[in-house]
Amino acid sequence: TIQWPFFLKDPEKGIINEHARDFYNDVIDTILHYHKKPFVSLEHWDIPAAFLKDFDGWCDRKMLEYYRLYARRVFECFADRVPYFFAFTEPNIPIDNGYMDGIWYPFTHDPKKCYQAHFHKMVATAIAKQEYLPFQKKYHGKLGAMIHYTPVYSRSEEIRDVIAAYYADLLQVRIYLDPYLKGSVSKEFMDVLKENDCLFTYEKEDLKLIHDYRIDILGLDYYFPIRVQARETDYEGVFHPTKYYEPYIKPDRRFNADRGWEIYPQAIYDAGMRIKKDYGNFDWFISENAV
C-alpha cells in the first residue's frame, strides 16, 4: 500500500515527498527483479491527519478532489511498472469502526456520517478509474478494489431468518459489491437509508461516475462469515444495521478462539458462485485470507 500521508508532503497541493517516492520505487523495482507482479493499493485506512482534523475526512466532499490529485500522482510515478492498482483496501473498515461502532477515531455512532463517507469512497473509486484510464491505455494495467468480504448465512430457511439475512447482506456486503461490479447503488439500499434518516447527500454526476468508471478486478479479503437470525427483541436507539437482524452462533462451528472468528472455507466457493451468478462472472481473486 502507498501511504497517502507519507507519499505527499503537501496533500492539498499534491506535492510529492521525494524520499517516499524513492522508497516505493525501490520496493516496486525489487519485486520486479524477482519476476513478481506488484499489486499496489492507494489506501489501506490511513489518510492525511489534517483531513480528519479540518473537515472529518471521508465524510466531506473535499476528499474527492484531494483523492483525485493523490491518485494521479501515484499513477504518474508508478503506472509504467505496476500492472495492478487498487483504489482501496477494505474501504468500509475505518468508516464502520469510526462512525457506526465507535471503536476507532472519532469514536462516534453517527449513521448519517457513516453512509456519507461510504458513498464518497464509492465515488472516489470511480474517480481513481477515471484518472487511471490514460495510463491504462498506455501500459495496459488494471484498476480494482479490495473489499472486506463477510458473506451472510441465515440461521434457517424460516422466512424471518431469511429476511434478516437479506438485510445483513444488503447493508454489509452489497454496499460495495453493487457499485463496484454493477455500477449502481441499489434502490433497496437507498430506501433503507432513507427510511432510517441516514441517506447520504449526492449529486447526479456522482451516480454517473459510479456507473461509467467501474473497476476492472475485485479482491476479496475473506476471514469469516456473518451468521444471522431474526431479531428476538425490537431494536431501539440510533440506527445500526443490526436493527434488522441479530448475530447467530452456529453450535458446531469451527472456531479460532484467538481471533474470535469462525473458520468456514466453503464461503470462498460460495463467493465465487455468487459473483458468477449475480455479477456476470466478474474478474476476482482472494486478496487476503488467514486466521
PLM feature spans:
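Active-site region of glycoside hydrolase catalytic domains
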Residues: P11-E12, N25-V291
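Active-site-adjacent substrate/metal-binding segments within catalytic domains
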Residues: T1-Y24, T30
